[in-house]
Amino acid sequence: MASVNGPLRVGIGGPVGSGKTALMEQLCRRFRDSYEICAITNDIYTKEDARILTVAGALPEERILGVETGGCPHTAIREDASINLAAVAEMRRRFPKLDLVLIESGGDNLAATFSPELADLTLYVIDVAGGEKIPRKGGPGITRSDLLIVNKTDLAPLVGADLSVMEADTQRMRGTRPYVFASLREGHGADTVARFIVEAGGLG
């Protein structure tokens, strides 16, 4: 099923603790029986996120590759994406029929974006626990990602966040670009994200 242009590469970014790894796990579980898939994770000094996915059984260990960026995490996905491009090339060597590569950035800030050379689609994850004001702060991840995921909606009552305000701000900042409100630990919203990837990414 692999495209002649190579696998679809989906970049998943967002601040530390927003739920990127939870989303990676949910997507791996949804896609692994239908597509040739692998996952690449970025951490500054460890391969912790890769370990989490492996322990969770999201994919076989050989389909998960941890990248240690050793510095500013957004540099490894934007200004100098060579370490991640090399990781994609390695996975394509291991699995020549790859359909889909999920690339999780290291915890980054609201200004971080993926290089178009690295990712065909970009998803950005923020979380309700970060505060009601997060969507209105803007930044490329919030305003220009192909899909914005507002995660941990279940925590809204605990942190005093008004989801209707967050949604209004999200709509204002993104215009017509799509977004999803989710609670990924419970699996809520993951199907919508998976469907978006299939449709927007042209997966057959």
From Swiss-Prot:
It comes from Methylorubrum extorquens (strain PA1). One of its GO terms (molecular function) is nickel cation binding. Homodimer. UreD, UreF and UreG form a complex that acts as a GTP-hydrolysis-dependent molecular chaperone, activating the urease apoprotein by helping to assemble the nickel containing metallocenter of UreC. The UreE protein probably delivers the nickel. One of its GO terms (biological process) is urea catabolic process. GO terms for cellular component: cytoplasm. Gene3D superfamilies: P-loop containing nucleotide triphosphate hydrolases (3.40.50.300). This is Urease accessory protein UreG 1. It is found in: Cytoplasm. The gene is ureG1. Its main location: cytoplasm. GTP binds at G14, P15, V16, G17, S18, G19, K20, T21. Pfam families: cobW.
